[in-house]
A protein has these predicted regions:
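Non-catalytic nucleic-acid substrate-recognition regions in nucleic-acid-modifying enzymes
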Residues: 1-20
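Conserved AdoMet
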Residues: 27-74
Length: 74
């Protein structure tokens, strides 16, 4: 899955539980891929491998269930 598609999907998923779903999605993805946020804008076409996508899905599920960003980020 491309980075831009992953962000769009995550934003949609978080829209019911977050006041800032796009920002949350970007921050969680950056944490998952261990890159700065600017990387998402510079390389939207980069692909996520299956393992990274699974880890991203795990943190999204935590956020969807209402876990605060600060707790997820550690």
């Amino acid at each position: 899955m491309r980075l831009d598609v992953a962000i769009a999907d995550a934003t949609q998923r978080l829209s019911q539980t977050s006041e800032s779903p796009r920002l949350d999605a970007e921050i969680l993805l950056c944490r998952t891929i261990d890159m700065p946020r600017s990387y998402l804008f510079a390389h939207p076409e980069d692909e996520l491998d299956e393992l990274t996508l699974a880890r991203f899905d795990e943190v999204l599920q935590r956020r969807e269930s209402g876990v605060p960003m600060a707790y997820i980020m550690g």
